[in-house]
Structures are given as C-alpha cells and as structure tokens.
Amino acid sequence: MSRYRGPRVRIIRRLGALPGLTNKTPQLKSSSITQSTSNKKISQYRIRLEEKQKLRFHYGITERQLLNYVRIARKAKGSTGEVLLQLLEMRLDNVIFRLGMFPTIPGARQLVNHRHILVNGPIVDIPSYQCKPQDFITIKNQQKSEAIISKNIEFYQKYKIPNHLTYNYLEKKGLVNQILDRESIGLKINELLVVEYYSRQA
C-alpha cells in the first residue's frame, strides 16, 4: 500500500490530530467506534486499526514499512511498542520535523529527497535514515536551502522542541542528544494496540 496522497482534513476528522501530516485542526466528527459497540469483536478490531492508521498517516509511511518496523521492534530488547515509536521518531524526515525545520513530515521528506539535508557533513537523501545520538543535522550552504529552513524555523519557534533534540538557530544546526523517551512522542497514540493489530502478521 502506497503513501496516502488524498485530502488530509478528511483523515484527521476520522483519526484526530496528526501533527506530522498537517497542522490543521478542524472540528472532529464523532468516531464510528463510539456510535456502534454492539459487536465487541468488530469494535476492538476497529480501535486497533485506527491506532495503526494514526501511525501510518502521522509518519507518512506505507503499510509495508510499518510492518517492517514492527518486526524490527519485536526482535529488539525492551517494550515492542516503545521501540517501535523510537524507530519511527528517529527517522530523518521526522527529526527534521521535530526540530522545526519544516512544519509537516511530508514537507520534511521533500527536503531530504531534494538533497537539502546533511547529516554529520555528507548529504543524506534517504528519509528513512535512522538518526543516532550525537548526529548533527544541517542544511546545504545554498541560498535556496537556507531560505526554506529559515522561513519554517521562524514559524515553528512557538512550538517546543523535544528534549532529545537541540536546534542552534544561529548556526542552523540540529543535534540529536539521545534516544527519546515515551513522554516525548508528539502524537496521542496507544502503541500497544498497534502491536496487537500486527500480532498475527509480524
């Protein structure tokens, strides 16, 4: 399944706020889950499905990519759900978004694809690149690249950068301080339900 490219407002009306997908916050419609709970099996499946969809649309990844992340998380030490969130949060496109270099993850992904982003010096054009503690995120020393980032940083300064990241506004340089903890996740999500959804597939 490919990435969603349709109307974003329709998605957040159904799933709730997804800051990675869009910064719009329209009035939410009543969830179909709360309207019909007569069949418990279907209701629980829908709840797990919607939590899974939240991750997919927020981080802008395909179904196959999410399944692969779940499989990796299952093999790692620690809570599968927490490791899954850490893997998604440490993607380069998401780190750029959380640093405030672009207001959405799809926009941040374009910055990476168009070769505007450097990690520890070299250009990295892979949005799924896994950032690590002490990685430096910078932009190409070109007028166009700097103009794009500067405009977004000024807009995004009103939002708090999470503790696992630091951004130097003068040097236009981001730093990954550490692997983030659960409290720093920028999305309202129950990751255990996502793990349960994939329990028979991963």
Swiss-Prot record:
<dbReference type="GO" id="GO:0006412">
    <property type="term" value="P:translation"/>
</dbReference>
<keyword id="KW-0150">Chloroplast</keyword>
<dbReference type="GO" id="GO:0009507">
    <property type="term" value="C:chloroplast"/>
</dbReference>
<dbReference type="InterPro" id="IPR018079">
    <property type="entry name" value="Ribosomal_uS4_CS"/>
</dbReference>
<keyword id="KW-0689">Ribosomal protein</keyword>
<comment type="function">
    <text>One of the primary rRNA binding proteins, it binds directly to 16S rRNA where it nucleates assembly of the body of the 30S subunit.</text>
</comment>
<dbReference type="Pfam" id="PF01479">
    <property type="entry name" value="S4"/>
</dbReference>
<keyword id="KW-0699">rRNA-binding</keyword>
<comment type="similarity">
    <text>Belongs to the universal ribosomal protein uS4 family.</text>
</comment>
<dbReference type="InterPro" id="IPR002942">
    <property type="entry name" value="S4_RNA-bd"/>
</dbReference>
<comment type="subunit">
    <text>Part of the 30S ribosomal subunit. Contacts protein S5. The interaction surface between S4 and S5 is involved in control of translational fidelity.</text>
</comment>
<dbReference type="InterPro" id="IPR001912">
    <property type="entry name" value="Ribosomal_uS4_N"/>
</dbReference>
<dbReference type="GO" id="GO:0003735">
    <property type="term" value="F:structural constituent of ribosome"/>
</dbReference>
<dbReference type="GO" id="GO:0019843">
    <property type="term" value="F:rRNA binding"/>
</dbReference>
<comment type="function">
    <text>With S5 and S12 plays an important role in translational accuracy.</text>
</comment>
<protein>
    <recommendedName>
        <fullName>Small ribosomal subunit protein uS4c</fullName>
    </recommendedName>
</protein>
<dbReference type="InterPro" id="IPR036986">
    <property type="entry name" value="S4_RNA-bd_sf"/>
</dbReference>
<dbReference type="Pfam" id="PF00163">
    <property type="entry name" value="Ribosomal_S4"/>
</dbReference>
<keyword id="KW-0934">Plastid</keyword>
<dbReference type="InterPro" id="IPR005709">
    <property type="entry name" value="Ribosomal_uS4_bac-type"/>
</dbReference>
<dbReference type="InterPro" id="IPR022801">
    <property type="entry name" value="Ribosomal_uS4"/>
</dbReference>
<feature type="domain" description="S4 RNA-binding">
    <location>
        <begin position="90"/>
        <end position="153"/>
    </location>
</feature>
<keyword id="KW-0687">Ribonucleoprotein</keyword>
<dbReference type="GO" id="GO:0015935">
    <property type="term" value="C:small ribosomal subunit"/>
</dbReference>
<dbReference type="GO" id="GO:0042274">
    <property type="term" value="P:ribosomal small subunit biogenesis"/>
</dbReference>
<keyword id="KW-0694">RNA-binding</keyword>
